[in-house]
A protein has these predicted regions:
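RNA pseudouridine synthases
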Residues: 2-349
C-alpha cells in the first residue's frame, strides 16, 4: 500500500493511497482494514456507505465488496465527529487546547493537556499536538519527544527537521533534564527522597503486555532505569511528589512509583490489579473501577524541562489535577505552585 499523501486538520483527516500489485483484486473493505486496524468491520462498512471512501474515476458511494485494482487511487476522508470523545463514567470530558509557553526561533514549547497525543497514531488523528500547531501556524510541525496520551505537561515541537533532530539527540543522549509532578496513593513510606534503580522490561507472557515489570538493579533481566523522587506534601492518604527521570524508559515513573509503594492516582495499569486496565480498554469498566481510579487519567504532569542551551521551562499545573487537589485535599494551589517552581528550578538549573 503506497501512501500518496496524508493531510491532518483538527476536524478532518484526508489520505490517498495507491493500490499495489499484491493488493490487486482485493475487496474494498478488506483493503481498508489494512489502514484502519482499530476499526471494526461495521465501522469500515459505514465509512464506505457514507461516501467517506472514494476510488478515483469511479462513481460513489461504493459497496464493501467492490474490488480495487493495481494503480487505482483510493481517497479516504475521516471527519472528527465523535471519534475522539473521551468519556468518564458516561460523561464526556472536556478536551481543552494546549497552551503555547514559548516559541523561540524553530522551537515550540507547549503545555499539553491530558488525552492529547503528540502526533497522529491509531484512531487518534485529530486531538494531537502536531496537528493543532500545524493548523495554528500553517506550517509543518515535527515532534521532538513523546508524552503518554494521559500525561499532561511540557511538550517540545519543532518547525523544521534539523531542529527536531538536534533536540531529539539531546533527549536520547541524556542531555535534557526533566521534572514531573505526581499525585500518588500512600500505601507505604518509601523514605523520601530516594533513587529508584530497578531495571525494567515487558513480559510477553503477561497480560496486559503493555505492563512494564521491575527487576533488581543487579539483575541480568530488563534494561537499566533510574528515577529520583522528592516529596512535596504528604496529606491524608496521598503523596504529592516530584520525579526526576535520569533515563527514559516506557512508563518509568509510574512503574518505579508503584513498585515502591505509591501507585499514581488514576493509574489503571499499575494500581495493583491490571485487569482494571483491561476493563477500561474494553469499555466495560464498572462503577467500582471508576471509584477506585477517582480521576479519568493517571496523575502525572511534565512540569519542568531544561535543554542544554535554554533556561528552565516550567509548566502550570493542569486544570483536572488542580480541581481534584482543591476538592479532595483543600490545598492552597498558589503556595503549591511556588514550592514546585522553586524546587524544579533548583534541581534542573
Amino acid at each position: 500500500m503506497a501512501t500518496l499523501f496524508k493531510r491532518f486538520t483538527p476536524d478532518l483527516y484526508e489520505a490517498c493511497y495507491s493500490v499495489e500489485e499484491e493488493e490487486d483484486g482485493l475487496r474494498l473493505d478488506k483493503y481498508l482494514a489494512r489502514f484502519f486496524p482499530s476499526f471494526s468491520r461495521e465501522q469500515i462498512k459505514r465509512k464506505i456507505s457514507n461516501g467517506q471512501v472514494r476510488i478515483k474515476n469511479r462513481p460513489h458511494p461504493h459497496k464493501p465488496n467492490s474490488k480495487v485494482y493495481i494503480s487505482e487511487e483510493v481517497y479516504i476522508f475521516t471527519p472528527r465527529g465523535e471519534l475522539e470523545d473521551e468519556l468518564w463514567d458516561g460523561e464526556k470530558l472536556p478536551l481543552p487546547d494546549p497552551t503555547l509557553m514559548a516559541k523561540e526561533e524553530d522551537l515550540i514549547v507547549v503545555n499539553k493537556p491530558p488525552f492529547m497525543t503528540t502526533h497522529p497514531t491509531g484512531k487518534h488523528l485529530f486531538y494531537c499536538a502536531t496537528v493543532f500547531y500545524e493548523h495554528e501556524f500553517n506550517h509543518t510541525v515535527h515532534s521532538i519527544h513523546r508524552l503518554d496520551r494521559e500525561t499532561s505537561g511540557i511538550q517540545l515541537l519543532a518547525l523544521n527537521p534539523k531542529t527536531a533532530t538536534r533536540y531529539t539527540d539531546d533527549f536520547e543522549n541524556g542531555r535534557v533534564k526533566k521534572a514531573y509532578f505526581l499525585i500518588a496513593h500512600k500505601t507505604k513510606d518509601p523514605g523520601f527522597p530516594f533513587s529508584a534503580k530497578e531495571r525494567m522490561d515487558h513480559d510477553m507472557n503477561f497480560v496486559p503486555r503493555v505492563f512494564v515489570h521491575c527487576y533488581p538493579e543487579d539483575s541480568q533481566m530488563g534494561r537499566s532505569a533510574h528515577t529520583e523522587f522528592e516529596l512535596l506534601i504528604e496529606k491524608d492518604d496521598y503523596y504529592l511528589a516530584l520525579a526526576y527521570p535520569q533515563t527514559g524508559r516506557q512508563h518509568q515513573i509510574r512503574t518505579h512509583a508503584a513498585f515502591h509503594g505509591f501507585p499514581l492516582l488514576g493509574d489503571k495499569l499499575y494500581n495493583g490489579d491490571p485487569t482494571v486496565f483491561m476493563r477500561f480498554k474494553d469499555q466495560i469498566a464498572t462503577k467500582d473501577d471508576h471509584q477506585l481510579m477517582q480521576i479519568p487519567r493517571h496523575a502525572l504532569h511534565s512540569v519542568g524541562i531544561k535543554l542544554p542551551d535554554k533556561d528552565v521551562f516550567i509548566a502550570d499545573l493542569p486544570y483536572d489535577l488542580v480541581e481534584w487537589m482543591k476538592s479532595q485535599l483543600y490545598l492552597d494551589i498558589d503556595q503549591l505552585t511556588q514550592m514546585i517552581q522553586k524546587r524544579v528550578k533548583e534541581k534542573l538549573s
